[in-house]
Amino acid sequence: MALSAAIVLAAGEGTRMRSNKPKVLHAFAGKTFLNRVMDSVAVLNPDTLAVVVHFQAERVAEAARSYDEQVTIVNQDDIPGTGRAVQCAMAQLTEAGKVDGPVLIAASDMPLLDSETLHRLVEFHTASGNGATVLTTILDDPTGYGRIIRDREGNVLRIVEQKDANRSELAVQEVNTSVYVFEASVLTEAIAGLKSNNAQGEFYLTDALETAKAAGKVGAFAAPDPLTVEGVNDRVQLAALSKTYNRRVCERWMRDGVTILDPETTWIEDDVQIGRDATILPGSFLQGHTVVGEDAIVGPYTTLIDTTVDEGAVVERSRVQESHIGARTNIGPWTYLRPGNEFGEDAKAGAFVEMKKAHIGNGTKVPHLSYVGDAQLGDHTNIGGGTITANYDGVHKNSTTIGSGCHVGAGNLFVAPVEVGNNVTTGAGSVVRHAVPSDTMVYSENTQHNVEGWKPAWER
C-alpha cells in the first residue's frame, strides 16, 4: 500500500470556536488538532506530506514544521473552499513532480482520526479499484454534515452539503467525514472543473466526486468507530468529545490494572504511562510524558506534567512539573514542584513547600513551609519548617549544597552560593552565609531585646 501524497487541510479559521487562534491549533488530550491528524497520517508513510494553510498561515505552518521539518506547506489563496485548497496543493505537488498514485486528503479538525481507520480506507480503495473513495460514517444526528447520496444499487452518486440539501437528502444519516482517497490522475481532472454555484459560494471538494465518476469508480468506506471521525466545530463539541474520549482512556487503564476512583474528574493524556496497581484519585490531571509507577498513589486534586513518579510514591494535592519522584517518596499536600527536581527514595516534600531544580537525597525530608531552589540535599537530612534557600542575587541563580545527615533548624536562611558539609546541625533562625564544615553546629547570634511598657502607635 503506497501513498503518493497526503494532503491535510488546515486553512480554515474555525469561526465557531470564537478564538484568536486557528481551530487546528486548539488542544485535545495534550496535542493540537493538527498534530494529532499529522500523527495518524504519518503512520501511512506517504511519499509527500502536505499541509494547506491560509488563516494565520505562518502560525499554522510553524506548528506543522515543528512536527515534521520535511512537511510541504501549501498556501491557499483567497478563493474559499476545500476544493480550492486541494487545487492549490495539487498544483504545487504536481509542479514539483511529487504526486503520481493514490492521494489521501484529510481535514484537520478530527482529533481522534486514527491511523488504523486510514490504513483500512486506503486498502479498501486499492482493493476496490476505485478512482475515488470517501470515508463515511452513520450518525443518529447528522446535522451540519454533508450527506452521502447513493443510487438504488448503493453506488455513491454525490455528496450534498447541509445548506444545499433538500428535505429527502437531509433525512440521510450517512455523512461525509471530509477524508478521501483519490487516484492522482482522477483528482487532477475532477478538481479542474469545480464551480462555486452553491449556497456558500465556495469550491467544494465534494463536488469533485461527481466529476470523478466519469474517470473512475467512486466508492465509500464506513469508519468502524464514528468517534474517530467526529469533527469539532465549537467549544461545546470540543468539551463533549474530550469527555467521551477521556472516559475511554480511563477505562483502558482500569482494565489494565489501574484504580481510578472517579473517571469523570480524572484526565489522562495520550502519552502518559501508568503501572499496575497504581491509584489515581479524583481531580487529578496527568499530562505530557508523565509516568506513574506501580503501587503509586496520585491525588486527589493533583497535576503531573512530564513527571515520573516511581513505585510506591504518593503525590497528594500538588502540582509537579518535569520532576522525578523516587520510590516511596511522599509529596504534598499543597506542594509546588517546578521543573528540574530529582528526588531519591523514601524522601518527602510536605505542605506548602516549593522547589525548583533541587536534588533531594534518599530519606531526606522537607516537611513544610519551605523554598528549596537550585539546591543539592544529601541523604537523610531534615529541613526545618520555614527554611529558605536564597538563590537569586538579582542577576544569577546560585546553588546551595547541604550534605547528608544534617539537621536544619526552623526558620533558616541559606544565602547562596553556600556549602554545608555532612552531619551539620543548625540552630533555629540561623542565617548561613559561609561554608560550614562537616560535623559542625552552626547558629546565628541574634540578640533579643525586650522593650518594657511598649504600646502600639494606635494606643499612644
Swiss-Prot record:
State its location(s): Cytoplasm
Tell me the residue numbers annotated for binding UDP-N-acetyl-alpha-D-glucosamine: 9-12, 23, 76, 81-82, 146, 161, 176, 233, 338, 356, 371, 382
Provide the Gene Ontology terms for cellular component. cytoplasm; membrane
Q: Which cofactor does it need?
A: Mg(2+)
Give the binding site residues for Mg(2+).
Answer: D109, N233
Residues given in the record as acetyl-CoA binding sites: N391, Y392, A428
Q: What is its EC number?
A: 2.7.7.23, 2.3.1.157
UniProt cross-references to Gene3D superfamilies, sorted A to Z: Hexapeptide repeat proteins, Spore Coat Polysaccharide Biosynthesis Protein SpsA, Chain A
Query: What domain of life does the native source organism fall in?
Result: Bacteria
Q: Which SUPFAM superfamilies match?
A: Nucleotide-diphospho-sugar transferases, Trimeric LpxA-like enzymes
Q: Which reaction equation describes what this protein catalyses?
A: alpha-D-glucosamine 1-phosphate + acetyl-CoA = N-acetyl-alpha-D-glucosamine 1-phosphate + CoA + H(+); N-acetyl-alpha-D-glucosamine 1-phosphate + UTP + H(+) = UDP-N-acetyl-alpha-D-glucosamine + diphosphate
The pathway noted for it is: Nucleotide-sugar biosynthesis; UDP-N-acetyl-alpha-D-glucosamine biosynthesis; N-acetyl-alpha-D-glucosamine 1-phosphate from alpha-D-glucosamine 6-phosphate (route II): step 2/2; Nucleotide-sugar biosynthesis; UDP-N-acetyl-alpha-D-glucosamine biosynthesis; UDP-N-acetyl-alpha-D-glucosamine from N-acetyl-alpha-D-glucosamine 1-phosphate: step 1/1; Bacterial outer membrane biogenesis; LPS lipid A biosynthesis
Record text on subunit structure and interactions: Homotrimer.
What biological function has been recorded for the protein in this entry? Catalyzes the last two sequential reactions in the de novo biosynthetic pathway for UDP-N-acetylglucosamine (UDP-GlcNAc). The C-terminal domain catalyzes the transfer of acetyl group from acetyl coenzyme A to glucosamine-1-phosphate (GlcN-1-P) to produce N-acetylglucosamine-1-phosphate (GlcNAc-1-P), which is converted into UDP-GlcNAc by the transfer of uridine 5-monophosphate (from uridine 5-triphosphate), a reaction catalyzed by the N-terminal domain.
Tell me the protein's name.
Bifunctional protein GlmU
> What is the organism of origin for this protein?
Bifidobacterium longum (strain DJO10A)
